[in-house]
């Protein structure tokens, strides 16, 4: 029987569901990652998957099919651990595992982004992320190894805006969100990270208290940026120092930690801007 992850292409096939049906009959458990031509092939595949009542995800032209229950080689629970605890605990566990083995991670919401971003940056493959419905999440990760990239000219297409001053410097606070808006207009993808005193901007209602006569209320700029899909992270350690948690966190903001921060800084296509 075929187990774990199998990737294949069905481009050019008139009825890709026929091939997938044959593969499913020889698959006990695991994930099938299918690269398609597009909408028509995806519709053909979806009919088959609904017939078998199988869970699946569509990401662009790729269909990821879940078959059975994937069994992990090891499990670790990091619920309650604060940054950088979760990623260090998981990294230690992975260091004792072989490439290709599966680790099941149970974590809280605060460490979810850190773990998925950090683990991908280390060369591992995130197989599945599942909301358990009780405030915890289940991550299945396949151990891999980071491949050395050859030096090449990389186009800068992302901006990583880091604010460390928060409400203590209104000028830099305004600049943080205005710069993100300008980046969007220049076809750059902006991401905002609030750390140290910058974390004060993440306290619910705090941005609405900042207003300069020449500009709109800071809170309005923040909501506008969020509505355009810009991610705003706040450092978990800085948030904890200032008593900021999920209960008083500004809507739309996400708590993240060192792995997320370092993963962005390590991307060759990202230009960091410190404020």
Curated annotation (Swiss-Prot):
SUPFAM superfamilies the UniProt entry points to: DsrEFH-like, SirA-like
Domain of life, source organism: Archaea
InterPro entries linked: DsrEFH-like, Sulphur_relay_DsrE/F-like, TusA-like, TusA-like_sf
UniProt-recorded name of the protein: Uncharacterized protein MJ0760
Source organism per UniProt: Methanocaldococcus jannaschii (strain ATCC 43067 / DSM 2661 / JAL-1 / JCM 10045 / NBRC 100440) (Methanococcus jannaschii)
Lineage, top ranks: Archaea, Methanobacteriati, Methanobacteriota, Methanomada group, Methanococci
């Amino acid at each position: 029987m075929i187990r774990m992850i199998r990737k294949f292409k069905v481009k050019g096939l008139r009825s890709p569901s026929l091939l997938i049906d044959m593969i499913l009959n020889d698959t006990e458990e695991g994930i099938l990652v299918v690269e398609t031509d597009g909408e028509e092939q995806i519709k053909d595949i979806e009919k088959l998957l609904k017939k078998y009542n199988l869970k699946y995800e569509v990401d662009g032209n790729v269909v990821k099919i879940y078959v059975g229950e994937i069994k992990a080689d090891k499990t670790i629970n990091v619920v309650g651990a604060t940054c950088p605890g979760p990623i260090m605990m998981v990294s230690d566990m992975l260091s004792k595992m072989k490439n290709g083995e599966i680790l099941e991670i149970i974590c809280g919401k605060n460490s979810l982004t850190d773990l998925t971003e950090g683990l991908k940056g280390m060369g591992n493959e995130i197989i599945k992320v599942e909301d358990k419905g009780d405030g915890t999440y289940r991550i299945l990760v396949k151990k891999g190894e980071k491949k050395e990239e050859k030096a090449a000219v990389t186009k800068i297409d992302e901006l990583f805006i880091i604010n460390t001053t928060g409400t203590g410097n209104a000028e830099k606070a305004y600049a943080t969100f205005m710069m993100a808006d300008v980046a969007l207009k220049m076809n750059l993808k902006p991401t905002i990270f609030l750390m140290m005193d910058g974390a004060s901007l993440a306290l619910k209602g705090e941005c609405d208290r900042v207003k300069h006569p020449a500009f709109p209320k800071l809170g309005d700029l923040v909501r506008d940026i969020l509505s355009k899909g810009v991610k705003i992270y706040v450092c978990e350690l800085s948030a904890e120092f200032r008593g900021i948690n999920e209960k008083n966190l500004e809507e739309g903001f996400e708590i993240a930690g060192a792995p997320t921060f370092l993963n962005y800084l390590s991307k060759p296509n990202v230009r960091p801007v410190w404020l």
